[in-house]
Amino acid sequence: WSTGYMYRKSSMMLRAGLAYEYALLSGQSTFPTSEDLGRSFQNVLPSVMLRYEFDDSKNIRLFYRTNTQEPSVTDLQDVVDNSNPLSLESGNSNLRQSYSHTLMSRYGAANSQRGTSFFAMVSTTQTNHYITSSTFTAAQDTTLENGIRLLSGGQFTQPVNMNGYLNSKVFTTYGLPLSFLSSGLNFNTTFSYTLTPGQVNGQVNKSRSTGLGQGLVLSSNISEKVDFTLSYDGSYYIVKNTFQPQLNNNYYYQVASARLNLILPAQIVFRTDFSHQLYAGLSDSYNQQYALWNASIGKKIFSEDRGEIGVSIFDLLGQNTSISREVTETYVQDTQTEVLGTYFMVNFSYNFRNAN
C-alpha cells in the first residue's frame, strides 16, 4: 500500500510519498529440532523528492528515502555451526529488521558552448537496528549462558542488532573537451566515511573507515575507426577501531589502464587493453602489483560488416591476480583468489538487424 502527493510549479517539483510495507519470511528447521523460523515485519516508509531547475543547464535534486533489511533465515536459526571447533557460529532468533534513513543531493551543470559539465552527489545513510556481529573469544575453557562450550582461544559469533551504523559519500566529476586531441577529459573525486558498530567480548567496537580517491579519464572522439581511453584511479583508506586498535590500518589501491580499438584497412579489427594494479598497506604477502594485458585481432565479414571472426588472448603477461580487502566491525580480511591465467579464445559474432 502506498500514497503520494506531487506539486509542480514552473522550475520546481515536489513529490512526497508514504508506503506501508509488510514482509513475510518463511522458514522451517527440521534438525536438530523442528522449529518454525517464519517472521513477519511491517513498517511505514516515507519518502520526499525535491527538484529545482535554475535554468536549462543547471538543476539540483534533494532526496529523503527509507528502506528496510530483513534478517535471513540463517540469521534467525538458533543452531550452532561447529564445523570449526575453534570458531563456532550461530543465528539469533531475536533479530529485528533494520531500518535506514538516506539523505541525498545531486547537482548537475553543463555549458554547451564550452562543452564542459559538472556533477556532484552527497549522500548519508543512517541505520537503526543494524544487523552486525557479536564475537566472544574465550581466554580459558568457558561455558556460555546458552550452554555452548568454548575451548580456550575459541570464538563464538552470532548476529545482533545495534544502532549507530553510518555511511556517507561524496562524489564529484568535471569534464571538459580537448579539441587538439579530439578527446574529452574527466576528473573525479570521491570521499567516503563508514562507521560500523559491532561487539567484541561484550564491548562495543566501532570500526571507522575513511577513504579518499582521485581519478581521471581521457576518452577519444576521433572517428569510428580510432577509439582509445586512458584512465587512472587511486584511493587511500584509513581504518580505525575503538576497541581493537590492533586492526587499525592504512592502505592504498590504484589502477591505471589503457584501451585501444582500431579498424584497419581490409576491415581488420584490432583491440587491446592494459591495466596496472597496485596494492600497498595490506598484509605482507598481499602487497604487490601486477599488470593485465589482453589483445584481439579479427576481421569483419559479410555484407554491411554484420559478422566478425577473430582470436583473443587474455593475460598475455601471465600476472593476473585477484586480491580484495574486506573491513568489518570485528576483523580485516585480505583475500587472494586463484584465477585462470593466460588463455586464448576463437570467437565469432553476427549482428542481426531489423530491416524496419
Regions from the PLM with identified roles:
Residues W1-R51, D56-T102, T124-S152, S183-Y193, L216-S219, S223-I238, L316-T330, ...:
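Surface-exposed extracellular loop regions of Gram-negative outer-membrane beta-barrel proteins
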Residues L278, N287, K299-N356:
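C-terminal beta-signal and adjacent terminal beta-strands/loops
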Residues S11-L14, S57-I60, Q113-S117, S179-N186, ...:
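Repeated loop/turn-to-beta-strand initiation elements of outer-membrane beta-barrel proteins
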Residues W1-K9, Y20, V48-Y52, S105-A109, ...:
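Residues on the lipid-exposed face of transmembrane beta-strands in outer-membrane beta-barrel proteins
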